[in-house]
Amino acid sequence: MEIVYVEIVDVRAREVLDSRGNPTVEAEVVLEDGTVGRAIVPSGASTGKFEALEIRDKDKKRYHGKGVLKAVENVNETIAPALIGMNAFDQPLVDKTLIELDGTENKSKLGANAILAVSMAVARAAANYLGLPMYKYLGGVNAKVLPVPLMNVINGGQHADNNLDLQEFMIVPAGFDSFKEALRAGAEIFHTLKKILHDSGHVTAVGDEGGFAPNLSSNEEAIKILIEAIEEAGYKPSEQVFIALDCAASSFYDEEKGVYFVDGEEKSSEVLMGYYEELIAKYPIISIEDPFAEEDWDAFVEFTKRVGNKVQIVGDDLYVTNVKRLSKGIELKATNSILIKLNQIGTVTETLDAVELAQKNNMTAIISHRSGESEDTFIADLAVATNAGFIKTGSLSRSERIAKYNQLLRIEEELGKVAEFRGLSSFYSIKR
């Protein structure tokens, strides 16, 4: 049988804007019959130090130094000639070519933003050529699991100008039979939360990911308000809706002193662990991301040993979607879950490799957005393609977040009877 070979005939990029009004890269890949695939890369605010590197122009006269004309030029002048004539259906070879063309460990020569835009656009062009939805092209015939959404409705840390140390306080509507029902619950809780905050005199403007950023007395108060919103919206905490935290602990870690600053106090890893354990005992917390700094492996290992049988411990900055770092985490039993961000590693193939490695080792994978997003819905399809069971794509406001939720609604409808929303069963790495 002949392998389908459809030539890439053109690759081009342009500078477009992300949801923060900052420049980012959009790539277009054209195939021999005129089929086009287009993709826009996201950009993070709190970045792990081991992430693949996006290239910015640093010309202060344009976009305050955040332009991406160099990355665009790298696509048009270096990447395009190398990919033209290649088979659009050979994604691993396309991505290998991109990696070798760059030649650096962290994609700093051509830029992860240039490389990823092209990698995603090739996948989309191939799917479009076949007339297949993206999730089916990437995931094959068995792609059918709709993800449980982790919805970031209260922001702190580097995502907000308030006094909360933890970066994200999320609601997790896992106790439902379909994605559609879970999304509805999330939206209703979001609007109830808005009313509660408004009635208490808090500003209800939303941050980069669509969540609220109130000044509250403590991290614990944020959790209490979430519970209140869940109940007032008519749902049951710990049965239908749970709480997830993204601590982004590297952002409140003092490397010189080796301590964490939380709620105005210095805490050692051990004391911080106790602080989290108290919260877990009091509230229906089902998932905690980056509870410690990205180099504090020992704390991750100890914490997972203590609470990993009842809470999903997620590595984000710890792993940066990197198979090498993930392998270390698996060996050490550092976490029982990984956050997956395409632009942390920089190609579609490497992202799929990270998900596969996690799942093989009984770890869950959470497909995630970045704080600087766009109308591109690639990650919604990726979540279903990998049967990941989880997605983190922001709050219930701002079109660049809602775009992903709406795409998942379409996918659930398209899959019909074979669609699976596994709810609490998605947390297979903990004993729930």
From Swiss-Prot:
Q: What's a Gene Ontology MF term here? A: magnesium ion binding
Q: Where does (2R)-2-phosphoglycerate bind?
A: 167, 341, 370-371, 392
- Enzyme type, top EC level: lyase
Q: Gene3D superfamilies in the record, alphabetically?
A: Enolase-like C-terminal domain, Enolase-like, N-terminal domain
Specify the pathway. Answer: Carbohydrate degradation; glycolysis; pyruvate from D-glyceraldehyde 3-phosphate: step 4/5
Q: Which GO terms describe its biological process?
A: glycolytic process
Family to which this protein belongs: Belongs to the enolase family.
**Protein known as:** Enolase
Q: From what organism does this protein derive?
A: Thermotoga neapolitana (strain ATCC 49049 / DSM 4359 / NBRC 107923 / NS-E)
Kindly list the organism's lineage. Answer: Bacteria, Thermotogati, Thermotogota, Thermotogae, Thermotogales
Gene from which the chain derives: eno
